[in-house]
Amino acid sequence: MSATVIREDGAYHSFCGLTCVGWLYQKIKDSFFLVLGTHTCAHLLQNVLGVMVFARPRFGVALIEEADLSKQQPELNAIIDEIVADHHPSVIFLLSSCTPEVMKVEFDGLARAVSRPNLPVLFVPASGLDYTFSQAEDSVLQALLPFCPVAPADDRRVVFLGSVNDAIADDFHTEAARLGIPVAGFLPESHFRDLPPIGPGTVVAPLQPYLAKVAGRLARERGATVMTSLFPFGPDGTRAFWEDLAAAMGKAVDLSERERQAWERLEPHLEILRGKKVFFTADNLMELPLARFLRNAGCIILECSSPYINRKFHARELAALDGVRVVEQPNFDRQLRDIRALRPDLVISTLATTNPLVGHGVVAKWSTEFSFMPIQGWSGAATLAGMFTRPLKRHAQLDPLMDDPLWVAGLMPG
């Protein structure tokens, strides 16, 4: 059995795809992310990512001014020269934003025009008109795919799909070695020149639930086998992930004792989570595995909503959520009414709606944070659990009088 997906009429898009820069520029250490956008894009990146300009981060915004509206194509050569002189990148990602998309800028041609012999400039569609913010990583990985060497058919190794920090990557390498699973690498790797070979013998193991498109391309264009499993979030997901990966490589492993020990280490968090009612609004495409983890941790999932659900890519997660109300493209007005009626203990909500919910006395958590945190695998389980328990513990320490509507009367919209 599998959870029945209810589809409503809410917005498919939740937050700007440009924010994928926040974790990807740190992952791909010889890259530069150049956004063609407006002052709004620049303010978004600086404020959301919290990086000051004088820190000289490896991302920037080529600003579109009013005079550019009459030009056929923006002039970027001088900006590329400056990036090369200051940062010496091996690859530059040129990200689209809403305004140049509306202007019909021909990004593919623009990227080719400013590429150098030893410095590819790769177009990445990341506009909020087309993608949720986590899906923009999918676009970056699709841009990298042509630069992955073609592996021979007899090269039977694993490629982990999705960006994770170096500590989590080391954890996956260590666990694979312990289980005797040969690894070709990660997509993306820490350096552009180290991209893994991918071919018909490759087993692709997705680490993130928002990479359905690039996974499909790897299967179609390279003949790779894309593993279908739970995503490695929490002890339950991590056990299933490694057991299924071992099976795909012709090995049989039993990690039940490893899972039991992992849950045991999480007991201080589980004491807080058991019996709590949790409501997911839609934001980052990570809702399904997060809800599955919480359900197995003892929570009651009132609703798990996501902007987009891929029935094939998310099949195992949907099966694990059988009996849970799962909604695609939820109507937020309806959700507000349900939150008011059901009174959840915790709401996982968007950056834009969390503070207003808190203003109405709801205990809420930014869903945006999960994309930036090391929550995968055995080593990430405690971080994952802590992200749910922290707002609950913080609220429990507040004076009960702070929940009185008097404190927000007239401040928050009704």
Swiss-Prot record:
Binding site for [4Fe-4S] cluster: C16, C41, C98
Catalytically driven reaction(s): chlorophyllide a + oxidized 2[4Fe-4S]-[ferredoxin] + 2 ADP + 2 phosphate = protochlorophyllide a + reduced 2[4Fe-4S]-[ferredoxin] + 2 ATP + 2 H2O
One of the record's GO molecular function terms: oxidoreductase activity, acting on iron-sulfur proteins as donors
Function field: Component of the dark-operative protochlorophyllide reductase (DPOR) that uses Mg-ATP and reduced ferredoxin to reduce ring D of protochlorophyllide (Pchlide) to form chlorophyllide a (Chlide). This reaction is light-independent. The NB-protein (BchN-BchB) is the catalytic component of the complex.
Cofactor, free-text remark: Binds 1 [4Fe-4S] cluster per heterodimer. The cluster is bound at the heterodimer interface by residues from both subunits.
Organism: Roseiflexus castenholzii (strain DSM 13941 / HLO8)
Keywords assigned: 4Fe-4S, ATP-binding, Bacteriochlorophyll biosynthesis, Chlorophyll biosynthesis, Iron, Iron-sulfur, Metal-binding, Nucleotide-binding, Oxidoreductase, Photosynthesis
Protein name as catalogued: Light-independent protochlorophyllide reductase subunit N
The keyword Metal-binding is assigned to this record: yes
EC number: 1.3.7.7
Record's keyword annotation contains Nucleotidyltransferase: no
GO biological process, one term: photosynthesis, dark reaction
Subunit: Protochlorophyllide reductase is composed of three subunits; BchL, BchN and BchB. Forms a heterotetramer of two BchB and two BchN subunits.
